[in-house]
Design a protein with these regions (language model features):
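Membrane-embedded architecture of ER/inner-membrane glycosylation machinery
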Residues: 2, 7, 164, 168, ...
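Transmembrane-helix signature of polytopic, membrane-embedded enzymes
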Residues: 7-16, 101-123
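Extracytosolic helix-loop segments that constitute the early lumenal/periplasmic catalytic or substrate-binding loops
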Residues: 19-20, 37-60, 67-70, 74, ...
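Transmembrane-lumen/periplasm boundary regions of multi-pass, lipid-linked membrane glycan transferases
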Residues: 40-41, 176, 181-327, 335-343, ...
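Membrane-interface transmembrane helices that cradle and orient dolichyl/undecaprenyl
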Residues: 112, 147-165, 173, 344-347
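Specific aromatic-rich, kink-prone transmembrane helix
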Residues: 139-156, 169, 335-339
Length: 533
């Protein structure tokens, strides 16, 4: 018993340490365009005072619901225009998701198992990654987790307050990312009710009056913003937010970012991505799947719901014909953490079972990590020399931690190798944060370049970025930016008047010889800013 209490303190300490590692990522510089895009939209909310119809640029309507933009705008207003304001609110949401995952596990499990569920979630690679990249997915996962938590409470007690609060959380999920929040909740709740009925589980039957209360609460919270959008914009709003666009039902019928994959590839695309996102705990997945299958027949309701939550959502996104996007997987990690923690507790009682995660870590986890780095190198060959040194300290530390876990578990299975792996993972996350904090801005000094642009810009000067999206530089450069991909269009712009151009150093030869260019700024990442005067 004393040993069990000691390990509970160790798991709690590791969860708290993982939370601090997550929060330490708040001051990270902006490293990708989506964060800059969201920040630009939130900034426009504050500047225009328009909180209901959101804009990116004049005339460009945002095709996402408003909740996360509101949160970011409030954060910018409260603490200023800086990276902490851009992502701090989401880091807090990510940690709230860890707490809710712990509470869901606590409905059926002891303290140690629940702490293990929280520890798995806070150290999953993709959960840490997505927490640092502001967007809709962390908020969606949090609100649906809260909805399922209240659903479980309702199935236990049949209290109307639980039905109403579940409806409220689903409404917030819809205000975060559209109909997908409602679809996922209905499918998982329906599957849970069907399985409970078939297995004659002792769950409380719902009452239709309580269901109507939940639906009414959902409608009161979710509908007003959508009704306002329809009244102001008409059918194009319905088409964008409900039928097609980026989040409507039609989005699931065809890809919008890349070409459609062959059917067999589309169906299996998320399998390797899940193995990658679960690092360093990929080895736990087979044991979690085995425990999940057993749970469907004889397990407690909360654990059963987590199995159905992970399974239904994973099947849903796998069958969807839309783009296979890594971040869409985020919603499966809370239930996988809960089921994975149960599998680990079973392994503590039967230590030989822990050898399977060790073998899978060596045979699948490490190759998946190496394959992920190799695929990124193949996809972005020009950037390998820039980004690989940033990633290597993290990757090497994580790989060594996984090897140490596997070797120690094969030698003497138990809790200690798991604690070592969790600590090593946090060290690798900390190294990644430190490297990005110290080395990113010297490579990409966008603030310095923006200052140069502002100093040399005066109407009617044109500012062009060649063969690159404008979102990230556009966050810092406060004058209109034009994106050009075609060399002939670039040549016409260059000869048509005073022009500032951001482009890669190797693309300088594509500029016309007349008028000659003058160098205004260079970046170690290989980009330059030139002007034609």
């Amino acid at each position: 018993m004393a040993s069990e209490h000691i390990w509970q303190r160790i798991w709690l300490g590791l969860v708290l340490a993982g939370s601090l590692v997550t929060l330490a990522a708040a001051p990270l510089p902006i490293t990708e365009g989506d964060t800059a895009l969201l920040g630009h939209i939130a900034r426009n909310i504050l500047q225009s005072g328009e909180w209901l119809t959101l804009h990116y640029q004049v005339g460009w309507i945002v095709d996402k619901p408003p909740l996360t933009f509101w949160l970011m705008a409030l954060s910018l207003h409260a603490i200023g225009d800086n990276p902490v304001a851009l992502r701090g609110w989401q880091l807090l949401m990510s940690l709230l998701l860890v707490v809710v995952t712990y509470r869901i596990a606590r409905l059926h499990a002891g303290r140690e198992e629940s702490l293990l569920a929280a520890l798995l979630l806070v150290t999953f690679f993709q959960v840490f990654l997505q927490a640092t990249l502001p967007g809709q997915d962390v908020a969606l996962a949090l609100f649906l987790a809260l909805a399922f938590y209240d659903w479980l409470h309702y199935r236990r007690s049949a209290r109307p307050a639980a039905a109403a609060s579940a409806g409220m959380w689903v409404a917030l999920a819809v205000l975060t990312k559209g109909p997908i929040g409602l679809v996922v909740f209905i499918l998982v709740a329906a599957a849970d009710a069907i399985v409970a009925r078939r297995t004659r589980a002792a769950d409380q039957a719902w009452r239709w009056g309580h269901v109507l209360l939940g639906v009414a609460t959902f409608a009161i919270v979710a509908i007003p913003w959508f009704a306002y959008g329809y009244l102001r914009q008409g059918f194009p709003f319905v088409d964008t937010f409900l039928l097609g666009g980026a989040i409507g039902f039609g989005r699931s019928l065809q890809p919008q970012i890349a070409e459609a994959l062959p059917l067999w590839q589309a169906l299996l695309a998320y399998v390797p991505l899940l193995a990658l996102g679960m690092l360093p705990w990929t080895g736990v997945l087979p044991a979690a799947a085995q425990e999940g299958w057993r749970t469907l027949r004889v397990g407690p309701p909360a654990l059963r719901l987590c199995v159905l939550w992970a399974t239904v959502y994973f099947v849903l996104i796998s069958l969807s014909l839309t783009d296979k996007v890594f971040r869409y997987l985020l919603l499966v990690y809370p239930p996988i953490a809960v089921v994975g923690a149960r599998a680990l507790i079973v392994g503590f009682n039967e230590p030989r079972r822990l050898r399977v995660p060790a073998v899978v870590t060596l045979g699948i986890g490490l190759p998946v990590m190496a394959g992920g780095i190799w695929m990124m190198a193949m996809r972005f060959p020009q950037e390998v020399a820039i980004y690989l040194p940033l990633v290597l300290p993290f990757a090497v530390t994580l790989a060594l931690s996984m090897v140490a876990f596997a070797v120690l578990t094969l030698w003497r299975p138990g809790r200690a190798p798991l604690a070592l792996l969790a600590a090593g993972t946090m060290l690798s996350f900390s190294l990644l944060t430190w490297v990005l904090m110290t080395r990113w801005e010297p490579l990409w000094p966008w603030q310095r370049v923006a200052a140069v642009v502002h100093r040399h810009h005066s109407p009617p000067t044109t500012v062009v970025i060649f063969r690159e999206k404008i979102d990230l530089p556009g966050y810092y450069i406060r004058v209109p930016l034009t994106n050009i991909d075609d060399v002939s269009v670039l040549s016409r712009a260059w000869r048509g008047g005073r022009t500032l151009v951001l482009l890669r150093n190797q693309d300088l030869a594509l500029l016309p010889a007349s008028p000659p260019h003058r160098m205004l700024a260079t970046m170690p990442s290989g980009w330059v800013l030139v002007v034609n005067d």
